[in-house]
Amino acid sequence: MIQVLLVTICLAAFPYQGSSIILESGNVNDYEIVYPRKVTALPKGAVQPKYEDAMQYELKVSGEPVVLHLEKNKQLFSKDYSETHYSPDGREITTYPLVEDHCYYHGRIENDADSTASISACNGLKGHFKLQGEMYLIEPLKLPDSEAHAVYKYENVEKEDEALKMCGVTQNWESYEPIKKASQLVVTAEHQKYNPFRFVELFLVVDKAMVTKNNGDLDKIKTRMYEIVNTVNEIYRYMYIHVALVGLEIWSNEDKITVKPEAGYTLNAFGEWRKTDLLTRKKHDNAQLLTAIDLDRVIGLAYVGSMCHPKRSTGIIQDYSEINLVVAVIMAHEMGHNLGINHDSGYCSCGDYACIMRPEISPEPSTFFSNCSYFECWDFIMNHNPECILNEPLGTDIISPPVCGNELLEVGEECDCGTPENCQNECCDAATCKLKSGSQCGHGDCCEQCKFSKSGTECRASMSECDPAEHCTGQSSECPADVFHKNGQPCLDNYGYCYNGNCPIMYHQCYDLFGADVYEAEDSCFERNQKGNYYGYCRKENGNKIPCAPEDVKCGRLYCKDNSPGQNNPCKMFYSNEDEHKGMVLPGTKCADGKVCSNGHCVDVATAY
């Protein structure tokens, strides 16, 4: 049984109206002083761990008593978590620190269903909590021989720059379905019940400007990164996504790419470095670069709908604020783009709060995604199947003994539906994480009313003629593995060949880019791909655009004939500086009889597969 530590916070209510104090978050105009005093409930003589698995803090905020419940975030670090920095002469130094007994927690306020908390308990209490809809920050005061802490509202931190700060993503990514109206985006409990968690293994990179900004203090940088990712992890839990930090690299000697204020250039360079360098050294799903330089007119930029892509599963974030919460929200926003989420429109909502995917940072940073964001994220996951986030790190990669009640199915558990108060699974005993008597299953696509679905029940629909439907076996709650027809098998009446469960043909790609009444262009249009200019090429090698050979022209930029009303464009193409790959002919597309596109070449099907 987990021993609970009860810590009483004695609050000297000195609100200091009209005065100010300089804290880590900046200049604060209105704050309260608290003095933490631990009152332990451990038996006399018991060995107290350095950082408990669960704690409660009792404190007063604005004169009212509150109880803060905290649980250690055991999904924060991976088992093979590594840290890399560089010696003055450029040597790579990689270590694997012991992070089992860390001091980073998530939490909530008792009797406040909408409350959240993200707290570091390493040296006092530092972080944020939301109480009755308002965001509070807490941090220890740096006074000798004192346990004093400051508690203050985010709104009372002076903002140095009141100019509107924007995300650099300007073009929406189109999913397979049009965005539904807000009234159609209700996420039901039944939908949530069968949405399995996804796991993003995150790698952070810190540039030289950040090192200079922090006077070369690498430990200070590391601590800040831990606190930021702890908050990102908290934010994504409500999207049924766990974010685990698998690595941190600090460019302590020099930048490994040229970091420029032009965000598009820097993002492209970082993506290329990740693909050619970082991925060869460390397995991960997504990489984010934090920089202390001022990006031109933006505070972040990321590729959209790119999670798991070797180059484009990346984002860049400006270290815009001293408040970790603000930077964490920016990181969650840019990673949201990687997960297929666009900026929110006017009909998107997250209750009475601002939403994370607003194009600009809100006056008070939100920790909530909108209904639109939830739909777009899971639409991307279910339709595009970014496979790298399917693997569950727990048990092998994430340091975490089984914990009943954390909503993760771990070794020795038959089910895990959360705490007894929150469990909505009628098949599962929340107190023991065992199935209730008479239940065969508690989750899975082949589990209905706690029983295995009948043999032959469809559990995964066909997405194309290259992807047959899967059916339940009657012996398991899990749907059988997703099986595709063999790559290269003819499909769509020989207009295409199967490729990873799809039947890619140029007509469909033109439709996805431009809509109805748009078709594959005449062969003469594709000859433009022999130019090797900014749009007409077949592939990139070492950053250089390689012109197509005559036999490969249909494996470069896609050209479409637009017959829609008012249009007469026989060689319409799509090009964007932010995503040069979008608008290229997709891999596996038929380019001639018996031939398909592979790495910018038109090759025999037998050679490709």
UniProtKB/Swiss-Prot annotation:
Active site: E334
EC number from the UniProt entry: 3.4.24.-
Expression (tissue specificity): Expressed by the venom gland.
GO CC entries: extracellular region; plasma membrane
Name of the protein in its database record: Zinc metalloproteinase-disintegrin-like VMP-III
Location within or outside the cell: Secreted
Leader sequence residues: 1-20
GO terms, molecular function: metal ion binding; metalloendopeptidase activity; toxin activity
Positions of short motif D/ECD-tripeptide: 465-467
Family membership: Belongs to the venom metalloproteinase (M12B) family. P-III subfamily. P-IIIa sub-subfamily.
Lineage, uppermost ranks: Eukaryota, Metazoa, Chordata, Craniata, Vertebrata
Binding-site residues, Zn(2+): H333, H337, H343
InterPro entries, sorted: ADAM_Cys-rich (IPR006586), Disintegrin_CS (IPR018358), Disintegrin_dom (IPR001762), Disintegrin_dom_sf (IPR036436), MetalloPept_cat_dom_sf (IPR024079), Peptidase_M12B (IPR001590), Peptidase_M12B_N (IPR002870), Reprolysin_adamalysin (IPR034027)
